[in-house]
């Protein structure tokens, strides 16, 4: 089974989370193809080619989607991902009033096109640290278990 792992990262925090998740998913016997949304060739219409999806983003400003995610978000509305398992994650900053709002926005869009979104969403304060290891492992295990059903 092949998983598309797509992420947006400005400071490297979400990229670091993506690498940890990718390593763990591969250890649990799924293949992962990783895409940086800004630099790699991945579009919403490509998602149908994968068995499951992991999507990571940071939140811009007071709760906005990052610029590089906006077109993907809009294009996602035209896709049918009924039954596809999707795990959402990202780095967040508690300095801002809308903690991880972009992750929630993407989750709603994936749900609107029929995806089976893994709960809870994985929100990490800034860069992942040792205190986040267990939460990331739990998120990854829930995701892989749903995919293998």
Say what each PLM segment does.
Residues 1-4:
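Extreme N-terminal starter segment of soluble prokaryotic enzymes
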Residues 6-8, 89:
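Short hydrophobic segments within beta-strands
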Residues 9, 38:
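Residues in the short beta-alpha loop(s) of Rossmann-like NAD(P)-binding domains
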Residues 13-16, 23-24, 28, 35, ...:
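FMN-binding flavodoxin-like domain, especially the glycine-rich phosphate-binding loop
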Residues 39-43:
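Short acidic active-site motifs
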């Amino acid at each position: 089974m092949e998983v598309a792992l797509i992420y947006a990262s400005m400071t490297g925090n979400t990229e670091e989370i993506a690498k940890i998740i990718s390593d763990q998913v591969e250890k649990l016997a799924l293949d992962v193809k990783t895409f940086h949304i800004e630099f790699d060739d991945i579009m919403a219409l490509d998602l149908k080619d994968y068995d499951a999806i992991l999507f990571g983003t940071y939140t811009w400003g007071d709760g906005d989607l990052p610029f590089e995610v906006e077109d993907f978000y809009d294009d996602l509305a035209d896709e049918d991902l009924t039954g596809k398992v999707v795990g959402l994650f990202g780095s967040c900053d508690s300095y801002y009033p809308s903690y991880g709002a972009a992750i929630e926005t993407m989750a709603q869009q994936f749900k609107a096109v029929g995806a089976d979104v893994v709960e809870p969403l994985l929100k990490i304060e800034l860069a992942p640290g040792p205190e986040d290891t267990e939460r990331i492992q739990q998120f990854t295990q829930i995701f892989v278990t749903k995919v293998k059903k």
